[in-house]
Design a protein with these regions (language model features):
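Secondary-structure "cap/kink" motif recognition
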Residues: 1-297
Length: 297
């Protein structure tokens, strides 16, 4: 079974589509995208596949009511759902024919419980106790109200763009990187390579180098939270990655100082996230190991 589209109406309203060979991402693994007017914004395929599995494996064994009249849906908050989603899917039947369909699911938390939780949130009261969640769902135009598990409710509500997008600052294949230009503390360095993919040899100042720690630190740059805030502080490190990639021949990543615990990450001139400062330190140390190591030799 293949899900070709997810349309969300709720905390955020948007459509996620499945497109292979889209030309909209430097990663060939990216097949899911958020439609943003004329643009396609890459989504993390692992996160989207997990969301689809949650949808496919919903526990609908607990009936809150076998029959709900139109006037009674408000009892379950499903007269105005917190979230409505439509999933377009295709599967192959027993006759090897492709069959298409659309699944519609409406989700809401118990209205009284939701109101109580919102008041508690607004008052900033936090007892530290695990919150009890009672939630309901309606599937297609059924008159049945299903009681959802707390896990399924949380899984379905984790549908925002920030829930499903890539957490990594760079999520491409490091084997496609052919060269790296680095600016650090006012000095510029260039790492070059020869060969293809996993048979690539890296050099700095004509000396062969190991890049495992550098690439591990690069892939380790992951968002604590997403932001569009612009930095007015010091640039910590800048890397321009040259890629063997027709979609994006190069990607520029800049990390800026933010505070004692975080750095602001920018990709191709656009702020994307706040990352732990420790991750920036790991990257800087990996670069210094290469460039200072060669200088000492």
């Amino acid at each position: 079974e293949t899900v070709s589209s997810l349309r969300f109406t709720g905390p955020e309203t948007y459509e996620a589509v499945r497109i292979e060979d889209s030309g909209a991402s430097y990663s060939s693994e990216d097949v899911y995208f958020k439609k943003d007017e004329e643009n396609l914004l890459p989504l993390d395929p692992v996160q989207v596949d997990e969301y689809i599995r949650t949808l496919q494996n919903l526990d609908l064994s607990d009936y809150a009511s076998y029959y709900v009249s139109e006037e009674e849906w408000s009892t379950y908050g499903l007269d105005a759902p917190e979230l409505s989603l439509e999933a377009d899917y295709t599967f192959e039947n027993e006759d090897k024919e492709n069959v298409s369909g659309t699944l519609t699911v409406s989700v809401s938390r118990d209205p009284k419980e939701k109101e109580k939780a919102e008041k508690k949130e607004n008052s900033e009261e936090n007892s530290g106790e695990e919150e009890e969640i009672t939630a309901y769902a309606r599937v297609n135009n059924s008159q049945i109200a299903y009681k959802l598990t707390a896990e399924d409710y949380k899984g379905l509500m984790a549908m925002k763009y920030d829930d499903l997008r890539h957490k990594e600052v760079f999520w491409g294949d490091t084997e496609e990187i052919t060269g790296i230009d680095i600016s650090l503390e006012g000095a510029d360095y260039s790492l070059t390579s020869k060969g293809k993919k996993d048979d690539r040899t890296w050099t700095y100042q004509e000396e062969e180098i190991e890049t495992d720690e550098l690439f591990s630190a690069l892939k380790g740059l992951k968002a604590d939270c997403f932001t569009e805030e612009e930095s007015g502080q010091k640039e910590e490190i800048r890397l321009t990655l040259h890629l063997d990639n027709e979609v994006s021949p190069q990607v520029t990543i800049v990390l800026y100082r933010y505070d004692g615990s975080s750095c602001l990450a920018e990709a191709d001139g656009k702020t994307v996230s706040l990352i732990p400062r420790s991750q920036a330190v790991d990257l800087i140390e990996a670069v210094n190991t290469i460039v200072l190591g060669n200088t000492e030799d």
